[in-house]
Design a protein with these regions (language model features):
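N-terminal leader/pro-regions and domain N-caps
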Residues: 1-45
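Beta-strand-rich interaction/scaffold domains
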Residues: 6-8, 83-155
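A short beta-strand-loop element at or near the start of a globular domain
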Residues: 26-84
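A general secondary-structure signal for short beta-strands and their flanking turns/coil
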Residues: 57-59, 73, 136, 154-156, ...
């Protein structure tokens, strides 16, 4: 089973705000400066203050170079090594940041994202909701058909890990969440099973099934290229 490591991956820490909307609908944050063990990679927090509550949200972004995948994989697993856990259920969803780089302004670089809306149905989810977490080993997340399709159609496969119950759904917690809802992790990789070649191989980036002729000769009459 081939294994891919991320080309880039990083936590974007949102700015602490006096309102949920201000934290959740922000268009930028701050890239983490650590190189390992992101302590609150996926986070929603509502903290009581002397005068008012404050809110903060973190999201985690990952990119894999999938340019070498020319056939839709039979299956794929996103594996993340966990350390700590504080109940932040989440979804991996399709991200839209620029190839090869994650910037402060990518806090909302999520396909289908709309500020102020419940984005549960707007985004492209790459798996079912992740609701359990090992703090002493790899957490294997089975990716769905949308992810498999994008792995072959996109040269850069991009993911955002986003807390589901509040951040994605646009739901402010009723009670103060003093410790936040977050997960910590370090090592990430993508395992996939190569699909059947069939007639899906690409010739110079064009699907073979869409080519009628090669140098004037019908492909049906060509045994090999």
């Amino acid at each position: 089973m081939p294994v891919l490591n991320p080309t880039v991956s990083n936590q974007i820490t949102g700015t602490v705000q006096p309102t949920f909307a201000g934290a959740r609908d922000a268009t930028s944050g701050t890239i983490a400066t650590v190189s390992s063990r992101y302590t609150q990679a996926i986070r929603y927090s509502k903290v009581a203050g002397l005068r008012a509550d404050t809110f903060s949200i973190n999201r985690y972004f990952i990119e894999f170079d999938t340019s070498g995948i020319s056939v839709t994989p039979a299956d794929a697993t996103l594996s993340i090594y966990g350390f700590t856990n504080s109940s932040a259920d989440f979804f991996p969803v399709k991200a839209t940041f620029s190839d090869g780089t994650i910037a402060n302004a990518d806090f909302d670089a999520i396909d289908g994202w709309s500020a102020g809306a419940d984005n549960s149905s707007n985004v492209t989810k790459y798996s079912s909701e992740v609701t359990s977490w090992s703090t002493s080993g790899f957490n294997d997340i089975t990716l769905n058909s949308d992810a498999l399709s994008d792995m072959v159609s996109e040269d850069r496969f991009k993911i955002c890990l986003i807390q589901s119950g509040n951040d994605l759904a646009n739901v402010d917690a009723v009670a103060v969440v003093n410790t936040g809802l977050w997960r910590t992790f370090n090592v990430i990789h993508l395992d996939y099973t190569a699909g059947s070649a069939g007639y899906s191989h690409k010739v110079l980036g064009v699907a073979a099934g869409s080519i009628g002729k090669v140098n004037g000769v019908a492909t049906a009459n060509i045994g090999k290229i």
